[in-house]
UniProtKB/Swiss-Prot annotation:
Protein family per UniProt: Belongs to the UPF0502 family.
Region (Disordered): 175-194
Tree of life domain: Bacteria
Protein name: UPF0502 protein Shewmr4_1554
Compositional bias (Polar residues): 175-193
Cited SUPFAM superfamilies: Winged helix' DNA-binding domain
Organism: Shewanella sp. (strain MR-4)
Pfam family, one: DUF480
């Protein structure tokens, strides 16, 4: 399953609204366009026309990832996803897994901590460990749907990406780039961490000492 940026946004919005506003689901083209273009909880922020959203829907329909619904005399066609948890879907996911995949589709790669903070309307994770456990399950499927990205410089947590729109080739390229010598020496940083921490401590002590002397000088002049 390979999704374009626009297709991923449409699927992410349908997954989100199914949980957060079930009374308004399925979504009309207008409602779906508004959801795709939200200024909050979206990365990147898009400005899609209804025509572009319709193009994405037509493509998803050919892939059998959405279905159209109209009824009760209304001429307005509404759309629902067939991305997961349908009778014939290959993807049968827990609500926790749906929440994680939904957030990654809507906001791109994120850390477990970010996923837990942002998932409160989709699923109630009790802690980050539960998020990490769910991520692990999604990565260990016969067909993995998530991948771990190389840790960014200065960050403590790794980010994770979905593999529906973030292709495996892109993930592997990012990993190779991060592991190359020109990308920065993460291993060297790890080896020198103690020395750097000791140096920082020493500098902090020197700054504190200078501050004490400055305070004493100011006091003597006043």
């Amino acid at each position: 399953m390979e999704l374009t940026l626009h297709e991923a946004r449409v699927i992410g919005c349908l997954l989100e609204k199914e949980v957060t506003t079930p009374e308004q689901y399925p979504l009309s083209l207008n409602a779906l366009t508004l959801a795709c273009n939200q200024k909050t909880s979206r990365d990147p922020v898009l400005d899609l026309s209804e025509a572009l959203v319709q193009d994405a829907l037509d493509s998803l329909n050919k892939k059998r990832l959405i279905s159209e619904q109209s009824g009760f005399g209304s001429r307005v066609v509404k759309y629902k996803h067939r991305f997961c948890n349908t009778e014939f879907s290959e993807l049968q996911l827990s609500s926790a897994a749906v929440a994680i995949i939904c957030l990654l589709l809507l906001r791109g790669p994120q850390t477990p901590g970010e996923l837990r903070t942002r998932s409160n309307r989709l699923h109630d994770f009790k802690d980050v460990l539960e998020v990490e456990a769910c991520i692990k399950q999604l990565m260990e499927r016969d067909k993995p749907v998530l991948a771990q990205l190389p840790r960014e410089p200065g960050k403590r947590e790794c980010r994770y990406a979905e593999l529906f729109s973030q292709g495996a080739e892109q993930i592997n390229a990012a990993s190779l780039s991060a592991d190359s010598p020109s990308a920065g020496s993460n291993s060297l940083n790890a080896q020198d961490r103690q020395q750097l921490e000791a140096r920082v401590t020493q500098l902090e002590e020197q700054v504190a000492e200078l501050k004490d002397k400055l305070d004493s000088l100011i006091a003597s002049l006043s």
